[in-house]
């Protein structure tokens, strides 16, 4: 009986830890409603030096950020310099193109459709100066097919549109 109790406590602690890592996505119903009624659910597949992405209407960021600014989110750093791509859905990173020998994506220039599904907020482990990233998860089977066609594995993370970032607060000295 003691073993079962210990196992129960262990499983509850494990479950509580995984749930605690989830961050609520504020204003998600309003954001999804706005995207459904006001923004296109398609973009153009593009390639910028091995970075393959779906180029989207920049209103995905410029309009939707207004729903989450009061929560400390800012526009992601996708604008300003000529090499920045604005609102997008990442399909393939340059490192993947190199690793899997992808030279050319024949589908570039084609329209890609997607369906916004849900909102998520995550702590990005590799983006050191950013505390949280707010994005819209999208369903885009065409993008899975493209990755498969060029020999890439299924993505580790869902296809998504980043609409906001929350910078880490500087610690007081």
State where each predicted segment sits.
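Histidine-dependent nucleotide/RNA phosphoesterase domain, centered on the 2H-phosphoesterase fold
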Residues: 21-173
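Hydrophobic h-region of N-terminal signal peptides that target proteins for export
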Residues: 11-19
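Sec-dependent signal peptide recognition
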Residues: 2-9
